[in-house]
Regions:
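Sec/Tat signal peptide C-region and signal peptidase I cleavage site
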Residues: 16-24
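Bacterial N-terminal signal peptides that target proteins for export
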Residues: 1-9
Length: 185
């Protein structure tokens, strides 16, 4: 009886150890654990680095959409990324009369797919260094590699670098970026 329990315990330990890499933890973002069982909106709301993004998503009326089943890839600008915009821009965009413009900007950060960084890097390589990324907002970003980092070039030539990649969500993936991507003027 004891041998049987020891054998079962050993088999369970080996099985768990073999499966451990499949359960790799998501990175921390903004000081908060990102849970792959939560939606993009739920996780972003927990990140202290994404309070401006969350406020913008609420002001644009995109909470329900980004809480939906997806899959979505969101290139999520940090508060510091929003702070790089000209003074007063964020405040102006958050006003109700600018909802359409804000929605356009935010949806230029969203792709209707679950695009992990290895897949993006492969598409960049397959396309000889630059891969067009069509967003739900109608923008076409250019994904490129800068060393081992993925960068995104917006329609105005602005460049955002992915600083934290592959943050899995229940409805897609977040890639944290350091610059707000803007649609063509």
């Amino acid at each position: 009886m004891i041998k049987r329990h020891a054998l079962l315990a050993a088999l369970a330990a080996v099985s768990f150890a073999a499966a451990a890499p499949a359960f790799a933890a998501n990175p921390m973002v903004g000081g908060a654990p990102m849970m792959d069982t939560k939606t993009i909106v739920e996780n972003a709301a927990n990140s202290k680095d994404h309070t401006t993004l969350v406020a913008a998503v609420k002001a644009a009326g995109l909470v329900d959409t980004l809480s939906g089943p997806g899959p979505f890839t969101v290139f999520a600008p940090t508060n510091a990324a929003f702070a790089k915009l000209p003074p007063g821009t964020v405040e102006m965009l958050l006003k109700p009369e600018n909802k359409a413009k804000l929605t356009k900007i935010l949806t230029c950060h969203v792709v209707s797919a679950n695009a992990m960084s290895p897949a993006i890097a492969k598409m960049i390589a397959d396309d000889k260094g630059s891969h067009p990324v069509k967003t739900v907002g109608g923008c076409v970003l250019q994904a490129k590699m800068m060393g081992d980092k993925i960068t995104l070039v917006d329609e105005n030539g602005g460049v955002a670098t992915v600083t934290i990649a592959d943050v899995k969500q229940s409805n897609g993936v977040i890639h944290v970026i350091d610059t707000v991507l803007l649609p063509k003027n």
